[in-house]
Amino acid sequence: MKTKNHFPGIRQDWFSPLYIGLIKGLKVFFFYLAVLCLFRALYIGILHAFWADGTRLTDAIYAFFRGGKLSMQTAGVLTLPTFLPGFFTGFVSSRMARCVTLILAGVFLTVLSVLFAASFTYYRTFHANFNQMIFVGVQDDRAALFWTMVQQFQLPLRLLGALVLGAVLLFLFKKVYDAKCPIVRIFGENFWHELLWKLPAAPRLGIHLSARVLFLFFVCLIAKLSIFGGGLGWQTAVDWENAGVTRDPFLNEAILDSPQALYRAYRLNGRMRACNGLDFTVEDIRNLAANLSGKAPTSDNLDDYLTRTAAGAKIAKPRHVVLIISESLANWPLLDKYGNIPISSGLRSIIAADDADYCPTFLPNGASTVSAVTGIVTGFADANLYLTTMPESFAAPFPTASAPTMERLGYRSRFFYAGPATWERIGEFTRAQGFSEFVSRGDFGDVPGSVWGAEDEVLYEKFFEHIDPNTPSFDVLLNASNHSPYDIDLDAKGFDKEAVRAALPEKYRKDEELLRELGHYWYADKCLAAFVREVKEKMPDSLIIIVGDHADRYHIEKQPNTYERYGIPFIITGKGVHKGTLTANSAGSQIDIIPTVLDLIAPKGFSYEALGKSLAAGNDRGVNYGFWITRDAIGKSDTDPLVPEGLDGSEGAPIDDGAMQNYINAIRSISWWRPKYGATLDEQILKEKGR
């Protein structure tokens, strides 16, 4: 690359072309960032009519700056294909390098302008930034879609305006790209150059090298910020899944620039397309459903096999049903063998109380939080369907959905989430599945927390702000603190790390990371216990359920046995509950929670649909995506025959292999067919829709 000598009297070296090239790369990056931020500001301002009631200017400013952090990632992605071809071409010809860069910049700026122009109409139509509806539109009648855009949305005029905008931006880009950066003059011209040469050789060389190091450090810093969406690591990164933290749905969408919104649509559509079918025939499903329900396999309506009739309430109907899904709440700290480690005293005290019962043989619905949410919200097991992205989930609540069933019993349903409403589309998903109200971090204001959500104590505090003790309610709370990056100030919360360290086996006492993880379990446990006490004090007529979303995140042992690795607790407490409320041989998974609640409180004759069964009525097995469990054993669900493993890791006692296989297949096949194909069991549907 031929460059002007900006250091007269100093021999040009390898750094000069690198420096000039990187300066141009920074210009490209900051120009893209400025364009994206300008577009966001205009988007927020022009569409201000879509601001939610109560949204303030400060909320919009916060969304603008949070979006700016996210757009650093977008700008970085756009900079690479714009800048790198020209940079390497520059070693052959500076003129050619400039030409290549301007052409590529023109293409990208035009695309950004077209997307910007389209985003207004898109939001007015779908009340969202670009989303999965784009892929639905691709499958639609394209001719009709085209003429609709021409006639209703003035496509030619908008496209012309976008092209003009792209041309203006390219003109400005050329001016910025060709302009001399003031930093160049610092290194070779006028006052600074003359001042530098007046210094002795050694200081001059030191300043020269220091300037290079600082410049390269700045470039690396910008690169890191662009990789992590305005953060210095993934712990503080803003991405499309955690971006929406305001209380305003419109502002949450505005945080995403157009490329990020398109990426979101692509990822969500990919998840939905990954929902492959399971290998069951219609006849298989009919027979399995009949066997599960104890009915004859004579109906082609799958819902007939899911319909239950309550035998009658076992406890007085509570005014409130509160279900806490606690992040990474594993069961192993509650086992007797770990009783000396002081991280679970709160849950242990709840379990020990007379008004509580506890099932220690319980499985999560899947390996992640979203599986727990879908299992509890819809009543279906994890069956290789990404329910939070499937259109069927947003058409109407499934008949097994928890919120509509509880509302039929007179409860108002709410879902409280410590994180953003945009995570896994949880806000839209829970409302689509019948929850009357959704409350998330965006409703909390400026509160302490991590990238995943507000601190647990904040979530519980906000719960009481939304509750009327006199109005019956069904409330689900999903917390987030017991999650990496494990960055809560545990000392400020009162965690006695040294007491925990002393209780650990000698070989683990120096493991600071493990101590930090255990400290977050302690924090979750402490907040849970305090919350349960407060619920019982303020709303004594309440039924409270505590369950982990999943386990398998950390353990004292590096290779724990299967039960300790995957088991989660199921705790039920409140008025009317006593030891023995759950049967002695009870076992289950998250799809069994709502059936258990209904078995306890629903009046005789109450009709509902459910896949799971009640732990208060003898359910003695649970199954999820990869495992099964009973009161005495656990095992993988994909082996034939099934291989039992004792809860202590030893060889398990034999089980009825056929019965367990049928149960596993029934749960999976129904959880696959009903959400994806509906209630009708018809081979033709499978042929038309495919697996």
Whereabouts are the PLM-identified features?
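Transmembrane and membrane-interface helices of multi-pass
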Residues: 2-274
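Alpha-helix initiation and N-capping motif
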Residues: 35, 142-143, 256-259, 282-285, ...
